[in-house]
Amino acid sequence: MPAPSAEVFDRLRNLAAIKDVAARPTRTIDEVFTGKPLTTIPVGTAADVEAAFAEARAAQTDWAKRPVIERAAVIRRYRDLVIENREFLMDLLQAEAGKARWAAQEEIVDLIANANYYARVCVDLLKPRKAQPLLPGIGKTTVCYQPKGVVGVISPWNYPMTLTVSDSVPALVAGNAVVLKPDSQTPYCALACAELLYRAGLPRALYAIVPGPGSVVGTAITDNCDYLMFTGSSATGSRLAEHAGRRLIGFSAELGGKNPMIVARGANLDKVAKAATRACFSNAGQLCISIERIYVEKDIAEEFTRKFGDAVRNMKLGTAYDFSVDMGSLISEAQLKTVSGHVDDATAKGAKVIAGGKARPDIGPLFYEPTVLTNVAPEMECAANETFGPVVSIYPVADVDEAVEKANDTDYGLNASVWAGSTAEGQRIAARLRSGTVNVDEGYAFAWGSLSAPMGGMGLSGVGRRHGPEGLLKYTESQTIATARVFNLDPPFGIPATVWQKSLLPIVRTVMKLPGRR
């Protein structure tokens, strides 16, 4: 299967929220596998963002008035269109992001499952709910959920469909509009998803894609939005959080990670070695929840290292637009430089390469072998800093207690993986880890795919959560409507104020003793 045609890019380009697309300066988009130009994308400005917000605000008012079930119907139609167009979407993901096809398919599965989940649960989550009134039988209290308004989304290049539209879907079903800045390396992945949303019946002004540099477009979105969702580095997330704080708007972010795996005695090492190749090297390690540190109890460390090293050396790298390849490319020269730098620094300081360890320009300009290191010391760059590439280090430990201590010895806390002799033991270990998600007998997919449960990070790994009820309700303002029935707190029925005030405390104490009040 080839990369998408020029006609496809011409069609998608016109969906960008930019006036006079043909007259704008452009940025070249390359096919990652070859480094050859695919197409160009117009570069948006702050004025484009402001225009998109003006149109979005006008459209959002009507959208919020539509019944939730109608908004959900749009998302269901979008889900069905993703299923129908999955091969095209995978082609585009491979061309623009350099993924192996199975890694591209992970994104498609997420788009479908995410849309299905929020379309299914949004009516119940957003319906008004009763709350305990001040005085039972005399008052009525209801909690309603109002949309924030226009949500800003700033998305990364590594999962350019999942982390654009899947963060936007709950905002849209909650009654908001969205203005989104895709990463400059992968704008067409965002535009392709937007096209399907428009075809599903979403008014175009409600979902505006503005490509352009973060310093311009990202800043303008942060200046104008009513809520900001960001996925990217911890450093950038910190700056955006400060900006959002000054504006007193809500902010949610999934940020970096240095994710650990613990392998305890009794674990099935053949199974762990196979699963760890996916856990560590999905999307060439360019996955915020992928594993970069493996802690193995000493008496099984040698056997595990041998089995895992063999599995990694057998991985197939390639540029095929089919399922014959195990790992694709890094996305940019910057990523290749970081990965090479971390490995070179480690080996120069005494680390041992068990598998991989070098670039593969014979396959493509940005390919790097999946790499396994041992003898990694704290002073090495890869020991504590996120590589965000196909590099993982193995650390033998005396026991599970030491493994947990070292796994938690980080400022990050996004994802973790545990493998033990039994599910119960794995769950006990998992509960000791300081991490937003922990997978037992799996690397990352089960926690990510549990869409009814929250997903996010602790520490420098993020603020807030996506997925689950939290992933939708964060895009709303809760509104309490309390109604006084019969009488309010003024003296009723002509009772003198002095008598009424003396009666209030006994009344409150009586109410506190009612069922459900203690």
UniProtKB/Swiss-Prot annotation:
<protein>
    <recommendedName>
        <fullName>Putative succinate-semialdehyde dehydrogenase [NADP(+)] 2</fullName>
        <ecNumber>1.2.1.79</ecNumber>
    </recommendedName>
</protein>
<keyword id="KW-0560">Oxidoreductase</keyword>
<comment type="function">
    <text>Catalyzes the NADP(+)-dependent oxidation of succinate semialdehyde to succinate. Although it has succinate semialdehyde dehydrogenase activity, is likely to act physiologically on a different aldehyde(s). NAD(+) can substitute for NADP(+), but enzymatic activity is three times reduced.</text>
</comment>
<dbReference type="InterPro" id="IPR016161">
    <property type="entry name" value="Ald_DH/histidinol_DH"/>
</dbReference>
<dbReference type="Pfam" id="PF00171">
    <property type="entry name" value="Aldedh"/>
</dbReference>
<dbReference type="GO" id="GO:0009013">
    <property type="term" value="F:succinate-semialdehyde dehydrogenase [NAD(P)+] activity"/>
</dbReference>
<dbReference type="InterPro" id="IPR015590">
    <property type="entry name" value="Aldehyde_DH_dom"/>
</dbReference>
<dbReference type="GO" id="GO:0006099">
    <property type="term" value="P:tricarboxylic acid cycle"/>
</dbReference>
<dbReference type="GO" id="GO:0005886">
    <property type="term" value="C:plasma membrane"/>
</dbReference>
<feature type="active site" description="Proton acceptor">
    <location>
        <position position="254"/>
    </location>
</feature>
<dbReference type="GO" id="GO:0036243">
    <property type="term" value="F:succinate-semialdehyde dehydrogenase (NADP+) activity"/>
</dbReference>
<feature type="binding site">
    <location>
        <position position="386"/>
    </location>
    <ligand>
        <name>NADP(+)</name>
    </ligand>
</feature>
<dbReference type="InterPro" id="IPR016162">
    <property type="entry name" value="Ald_DH_N"/>
</dbReference>
<feature type="binding site">
    <location>
        <begin position="181"/>
        <end position="184"/>
    </location>
    <ligand>
        <name>NADP(+)</name>
    </ligand>
</feature>
<comment type="similarity">
    <text>Belongs to the aldehyde dehydrogenase family.</text>
</comment>
<feature type="binding site">
    <location>
        <position position="255"/>
    </location>
    <ligand>
        <name>NADP(+)</name>
    </ligand>
</feature>
<feature type="binding site">
    <location>
        <begin position="232"/>
        <end position="233"/>
    </location>
    <ligand>
        <name>NADP(+)</name>
    </ligand>
</feature>
<keyword id="KW-0521">NADP</keyword>
<dbReference type="InterPro" id="IPR029510">
    <property type="entry name" value="Ald_DH_CS_GLU"/>
</dbReference>
<feature type="active site" description="Nucleophile">
    <location>
        <position position="288"/>
    </location>
</feature>
<feature type="binding site">
    <location>
        <begin position="157"/>
        <end position="158"/>
    </location>
    <ligand>
        <name>NADP(+)</name>
    </ligand>
</feature>
<dbReference type="InterPro" id="IPR016163">
    <property type="entry name" value="Ald_DH_C"/>
</dbReference>
